Amino acid sequence: MDKKAIFTQVSSLEERIGDLHDELRGLKEQLAYLIEENHYLHVENENLRKRLEPEAGTKNTVTPSGESSRKKMVGEGHENLARLYQEGFHICNTHYGSIRPEGDDCLFCLSFLHQK
């Protein structure tokens, strides 16, 4: 092969890699958005269930494994961290309190929000 053909192939490969990188970035943004939306829907669902279940019937119910049948409520601190993340701050232990770059989601923060 001559040098021009090799250069053309390398240039073509570089362009395809750039396109794949852009596509991967878009998928990462979509995934982060879906994880975050799933978290908020989960919290909202728990709050709605809490309103619907009768207070007297579920407080003392225990499953065979010894756990309370009532789901653990998301605490006020967790909601505050979710609000801080929405406002553009890191809540992960790696970058806690620093400002996230505009439009960039942190997978560490999102995994922390989605913990059970």
From Swiss-Prot:
<protein>
    <recommendedName>
        <fullName>Replication initiation control protein YabA</fullName>
    </recommendedName>
</protein>
<keyword id="KW-0963">Cytoplasm</keyword>
<keyword id="KW-0235">DNA replication</keyword>
<feature type="binding site">
    <location>
        <position position="106"/>
    </location>
    <ligand>
        <name>Zn(2+)</name>
    </ligand>
</feature>
<dbReference type="Pfam" id="PF06156">
    <property type="entry name" value="YabA"/>
</dbReference>
<dbReference type="GO" id="GO:0009295">
    <property type="term" value="C:nucleoid"/>
</dbReference>
<feature type="binding site">
    <location>
        <position position="90"/>
    </location>
    <ligand>
        <name>Zn(2+)</name>
    </ligand>
</feature>
<comment type="similarity">
    <text>Belongs to the YabA family.</text>
</comment>
<feature type="binding site">
    <location>
        <position position="109"/>
    </location>
    <ligand>
        <name>Zn(2+)</name>
    </ligand>
</feature>
<dbReference type="InterPro" id="IPR010377">
    <property type="entry name" value="YabA"/>
</dbReference>
<comment type="function">
    <text>Involved in control of chromosome replication initiation. Inhibits the cooperative binding of DnaA to the oriC region, thus negatively regulating initiation of chromosome replication. Inhibits the ability of DnaA-ATP to form a helix on DNA; does not disassemble preformed DnaA-DNA helices. Decreases the residence time of DnaA on the chromosome at its binding sites (oriC, replication forks and promoter-binding sites). Tethers DnaA to the replication machinery via the DNA polymerase beta sliding clamp subunit (dnaN).</text>
</comment>
<feature type="compositionally biased region" description="Polar residues">
    <location>
        <begin position="58"/>
        <end position="67"/>
    </location>
</feature>
<keyword id="KW-0479">Metal-binding</keyword>
<dbReference type="GO" id="GO:0006260">
    <property type="term" value="P:DNA replication"/>
</dbReference>
<feature type="region of interest" description="Disordered">
    <location>
        <begin position="52"/>
        <end position="73"/>
    </location>
</feature>
<comment type="subunit">
    <text>Homotetramer. Interacts with both DnaA and DnaN, acting as a bridge between these two proteins.</text>
</comment>
<keyword id="KW-0236">DNA replication inhibitor</keyword>
<feature type="binding site">
    <location>
        <position position="92"/>
    </location>
    <ligand>
        <name>Zn(2+)</name>
    </ligand>
</feature>
<keyword id="KW-0862">Zinc</keyword>
